[in-house]
Every structure is written in C-alpha cells, then in structure tokens.
Amino acid sequence: MEASLHFPIDASLRAAVAVISAGAFYLLNLVIYRLFLSPLAKFPGPKLAAVTSWYELYYDLVHKGKYLFEIEKMHDKYGPIVRINPFELSIRDSEYYDELYVAGSVRPTDRYEAFVEGIVDFKGSHIATIEHDLHRKRRKPLDPYFSRLGVSRLEPMLGELTEKLIVNRFESFKRTGKVVRLDHAFTAYSGDVINRLCMDDPPDVLVDDPEFSPWWYNMFHNGIATLPLFMGLPWLIHVVRLIPVSILAKLDPGTQTFNKFKMMCDDHLRVAKREKAAQGSKDTSMMDARPTIFRHLLNSDLPPSELTDDLLSKEAQVLIGTGTITTAGSLCFICYHIVVNPAIKKRLQEDLKLIMANYPAKKPTWAELETATYLQAVIKEGLRLSFGTMHRRTRVSPKQPLQFRQWTIPAGVPVGMSAYYAHRDPSVFPRPDEFLPERWLSNVTPEMSRNYVPFSRGSRRCLGMNLAYAEINHVIATLFRPGGPDFKLYETSEKDVKPAHDLIVPLPSLESKGFRVIFR
C-alpha cells in the first residue's frame, strides 16, 4: 500500500526531470549550433547576441528602441560587419549600400520575414510582401501613381491643403496666445493628404479639428511603441488575434482608435468599388484627372486575387500610416532648426522672396520650388538628420550569396544597413550632428550623394518619396515665406524633435510634451 502511494509521485518526478533534461539538452545544442555551426558563426559580434534574440528585445522593448545605438557600439568594437542576432547581419560601410539595395534587374531582393511578422496586420500589402516577384507585381501599379508625374497631378490638392493649414489655421492663432502643437498639426496635414488620395473630396477632418486631431497622432505613436514587442515575439500577434475586439477595446482603449482608422480605410474602398461597378469597363482617361489610389488600383492589371477587400484595405492602412508619421517628423525637425537659427531663417526668406511673392494667388509648383536652392539645402539637411527611417532596412538575397570585402554572406541571410550611420559619417559630413544647410550649396562630393539615403534605394525604395518631397517643399516654403505666420517656441527644445528612439520610424524623446509654439 505504501509503495503504491509513492509510485505516482516518483513517476511525476521522473517525468518532470525528463522534460527539464530534454529542454536543457535542446538549449545546449541550440547554443552550440548558433555559436559554432551556424552559417553566421564566422561573423564577428557579441556572443550573447549570436545566441538569443532576447538581447535585441531587451534594448528595443525595455529601453524603447535603443538597439540601433547598441549596434553602433558593436560596429565600433568589431568592425564594419557584425552579427546582431542569431539570424541577421548589420553592415556599416556606405560604399556597400548600392551593392545591397539593388534594382530588380540586378538580382531579386526579398523582405526579411521577421520584419513582416512584426508589423502586425499588414501582410498582403506591398510593403509587407516577402517574395521579390510578388512584391514587384503588387508595387508595379503603384509606381506611376507616386512618380514625379503622378505627384504633379496632385499639386492642386497639395496647394489647397497647405493653404488651409498655414493661412487659414496657423494665421488664425496670431496674437491669441494659444499654445499650438505643430507635431499634431503636421501629422493631421499629412493624414489629410493621404485621405485625399484614397477618396474623392473627403472632409479634411484632421486639419479642421480645433486641436489638429490629437487622437490621430496618438494612434500612430501608441501603435509604434508596440512594434518591438511584436517584432521580438511575433507569435504574440496570433494570440492577440484570438481575443475578441470588445475585450481588446477594454484592455487597450487605443484599439478603438485603430478600428476607427481601419473603418475609414474600408469606407474609402467601398466608395471606389461602387464607382468601379457603375463605371463598368476600364476608363484610362481617369489618369488625366486626379484619381484616388483605389480607383487607380481597381483599373490596373492586377488580377482579382490581388484586389480583394482585405488586401486593398491593408494597402490603404500602410499608405496612410507610412505617409503620415515620417513626413510629419521631418517637418517638425526642419521647422525647429529654422526657428532656432535666425541666420538660416533670414536666408531662407530671401531665397523665397520672389517665388512666393504672389502667394496665395499664385501658388508655385514643386518644380518651381526646386529652383530655390537654399530651400532645397534646408530640406536636404533636415532629411539627413531626421533620417527618414532610422531602423536598419534588412534585405535578403534569396538565390545568390553576397560578397562584402573578405566575407561571403550565404544566400538567404538577412543583411541590414541604416541611414543613421550613413548620414552621420564624419568622413563624409564634417560636424555630422550640426544642422548646416550650407554643406549642400557647394562642393557637394559624390560621397555625400552616395550617403544620402533617407528613402533608401533599390527595388524596395520608399514608394512615397516624391509625395514626401512635394509636401515638405510646399509646407516649408509657405510657412517661412516673407510675410508668413511668425511664431516662437513654447517650452520646446531639440529633444522634442531630435530622433532618439528607433521604433521602426524615428521618434524624439518619449518624455517630450510635443513641438509647441505660440503664433505672434
């Protein structure tokens, strides 16, 4: 009897010991493989990073987007190529940039699967497409829409929205003493621009809001803060999807805001599909006017399988998200440095005197604004130091190995480089952390052009590059034209605009209370 009572306990203990032993044996073998047998074992870097992705997760989750700066220290210690996690390499050598980020005619380039898994719910959009050929198929119809010619068709709309923001809204704050958050204002402006691309004549609900729709700004910033968690632990996404929306809304009120955002995208899509159904056959003449992005896609050569409601809605979410936050951040950074540097502001206004003389009766085009050389230097320097995207842009060569100096990188290995390193290379940009537009006015070296990559390069270069340039040109020229609205900073310093956290997109200090000004 006594022996029978002990038997289950002994069996349970043995089972527990067996499970623990098996787990320990597996982990030991995994460590040995990653340190000594992996195809990446030959590459330099800290052993802990080679063993576990938790090393990266610690810096990005606990320290909120600081792994980029830890990688910089790795490069300082180990050299131009380092292993930054068990699966991925980082290169800091701008001469190699055009070898990694190539056109599709040179070789196919895949997206890193872990990145796609980590951006939550955008699989199926062009930006979250892993495989090269499928990405090319999905992006091809979008390229003409966002080309220089395509963006030129949007300029009347850009001019109208810019006038509404700066003349109607900003100038109404003169001598009121009201504290205005320009980060909210620019995020609302960029959001309304993309909304106009998605739907004919939508209400400009973001810019028209008395406080510039802080919910819109908060939705993106709160969502961005979760990215390190999902990129480090992508399986969590599948768990979250199992939770009913009603419960998620109670756990995280921000979910309701995101659902509002998704519903807005779905509304845009429904309008476009109704138009398509009423239209019947293709009407290529719509490109002569300003088509919405959905109308453009629905009249493209994409097969029906690529035009489902789910895929088109995700494409809209990506376009609205990526077209909003980075442009707004760059505008904040540029405006701050113009305001705190009176000499820069004075020279910029001199540069704009003739081209903006008859504004708003005559609104200059983007092409005309490009003739204002100092304006272009200010914008270029602003994009250099706001980086576009700080996060390493990881690429995979699926079929052929890559050669970097004496290292052969096996096919299929993810490799990333960052604009943060290229834009701050002191051998190319002396005094790299200083805002010096003059560096772009004369003696611009080939190395400066090579290292300037705010929108990346190659087959996966930023789709919205031309639109971003056009928006920034219109806003900066209109805001700082002679006779434009005058404002002063309110309890704002460089930490409120300077990128300090790499959360896929660069964010300033998370302690910031915003880019605040008072119009005089």
Curated annotation (Swiss-Prot):
It is an enzyme of class 1 (oxidoreductase). InterPro entries: Cyt_P450, Cyt_P450_CS, Cyt_P450_E_grp-IV, Cyt_P450_sf, Cytochrome_P450_monoxygenase. GO terms for cellular component: membrane. Its main location: membrane. GO terms for biological process: terpenoid biosynthetic process. Signal peptide: none annotated. Its cofactor is heme. It is a multi-pass membrane protein. The chain crosses the membrane at residues 17-37, 229-249, 320-340. Its EC number is 1.-.-.-. Pathway: Secondary metabolite biosynthesis; terpenoid biosynthesis. GO terms for molecular function: heme binding; iron ion binding; monooxygenase activity; oxidoreductase activity, acting on paired donors, with incorporation or reduction of molecular oxygen. Gene3D superfamilies: Cytochrome P450. Heme binds at C462. Keywords: Heme, Iron, Membrane, Metal-binding, Monooxygenase, Oxidoreductase, Transmembrane, Transmembrane helix. The keyword Cytoplasm does not apply. Belongs to the cytochrome P450 family. This is Cytochrome P450 monooxygenase oblB. It comes from Aspergillus clavatus (strain ATCC 1007 / CBS 513.65 / DSM 816 / NCTC 3887 / NRRL 1 / QM 1276 / 107).
